[in-house]
């Protein structure tokens, strides 16, 4: 079987969708018999990411990333994020003429634009550079794939995400008279949660999650169950 290395700037102890996706991918790849290694910021000196302190950014990562990959000699390399570790791994792959895949799981340009005056065109230009030589850019949905095609970013391929049926069982339903509309998300500005919370619906709205926007959203939407 193959030796697979996944390098990511988003990793434990962070709790977010990217981390969960990697954890599930690693679990299933190992069940298939592959040797899987994850390189995250916990192996490096790191600092909190501005505006999102749960994310840790590795410092001076290039030399150590090169040494780790030289030691592991992976058969396959997946660069999951566009941060310092991702840039270092991308550089390693180019230097060693190694094929690799990348992923786009966070709307990075929209996230930056929501917090700064940096236009989308600038960050999408960075993404075009970052992903242009990857074999495939793995994306979570057809919508994201279409967006990357529109911006001419790499070769996007849908990486459909499954549901853990040991936890979520839609056949077991609570007896409720009212309809319930549920949104699960980190409560942050780039998630555009007002679009859901402001809808006029024939039932209750439940918001599941936490984050920096929680106080504002609770005050603005007192009828929503958080």
What are these regions (language model features)?
Residues 1-44, 72:
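N-terminal subdomain of nucleotide-sugar transferases
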Residues 65-86, 96-101:
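Short N-terminal targeting/anchoring amphipathic segment
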Residues 99-101, 110-129, 139, 165:
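Nucleotide-sugar donor phosphate/pyrophosphate-binding loop at the beta->alpha transition
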Residues 214-226:
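Nucleotide-activated donor-binding/catalytic signature segment of Leloir-type glycosyltransferases, i.e.
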Residues 42, 143, 161-162:
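Carbohydrate-associated surface elements
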Residues 4, 76, 93-111, 138:
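Active-site proximal beta-strand in glycosyltransferases
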Residues 172-208:
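Conserved donor-binding/catalytic core segment of Leloir-type glycosyltransferases
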Residues 160-169, 188, 212:
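Short beta-strand->alpha-helix junction loop in the catalytic core
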């Amino acid at each position: 079987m193959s030796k697979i290395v996944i390098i990511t700037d988003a990793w434990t102890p962070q709790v977010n969708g990217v981390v969960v996706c990697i954890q599930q991918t690693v679990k299933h790849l190992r069940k298939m018999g592959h040797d899987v290694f994850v390189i995250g910021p916990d192996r490096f000196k790191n600092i909190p990411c501005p505006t999102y302190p749960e994310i840790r950014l590795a410092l001076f990562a290039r030399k150590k990333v090169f040494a780790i990959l030289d030691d592991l000699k992976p058969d396959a390399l997946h660069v999951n994020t566009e941060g310092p570790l991702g840039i270092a791994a991308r550089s390693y792959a180019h230097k060693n003429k190694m094929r690799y895949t990348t992923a786009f799981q966070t709307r990075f340009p929209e996230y930056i634009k929501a917090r700064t005056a940096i236009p989308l065109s600038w960050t999408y230009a960075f993404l075009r550079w970052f992903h242009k030589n990857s074999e495939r850019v793995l994306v979570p949905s057809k919508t994201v794939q279409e967006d990357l095609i529109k911006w001419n970013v790499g070769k996007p391929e849908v990486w459909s995400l499954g549901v853990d049926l040991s936890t979520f069982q839609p056949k077991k339903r609570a007896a409720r008279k009212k309809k319930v509309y549920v949104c699960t998300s980190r409560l942050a500005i780039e998630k555009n949660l007002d679009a859901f919370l402001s809808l006029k619906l024939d039932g209750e709205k439940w918001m599941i999650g936490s984050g920096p926007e929680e106080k504002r959203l609770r005050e603005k939407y007192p009828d929503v169950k958080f």
